[in-house]
Amino acid sequence: MAVPARRTSKTKKRMRRGHIKLNTPNVQFDATNGEYRVSHRVSPKGFYKGEQVVTPKAND
C-alpha cells in the first residue's frame, strides 16, 4: 500500500483545500415582485426580465 514519503505541511494542505468551498448564490432584488430571486432564473411568480413568461399554478 502506498505511503507518503513526507508529511504534508499545514500550508500545503490548506492550499489544496482552498478550492473546496461553498459558493453563495447570486441573489438579486426583483423590482417586479418586490422579492429576492436567483439571477438568470424565473421568479416564483413567473416573471423574467419584467415579463410574465410562466403562469404559476394555484396552490390549494
UniProtKB/Swiss-Prot annotation:
Protein family per UniProt: Belongs to the bacterial ribosomal protein bL32 family.
Segments crossing the lipid bilayer: none
Keyword Ribosomal protein: yes
Name by which UniProt lists this protein: Large ribosomal subunit protein bL32
Ribosomal protein among keywords: yes
MF terms (GO), sorted A to Z: structural constituent of ribosome
Entry GO CC: large ribosomal subunit
GO terms, biological process: translation
Gene name of the record: rpmF
UniProt keywords, alphabetically: Ribonucleoprotein, Ribosomal protein
HAMAP family membership: Ribosomal_bL32
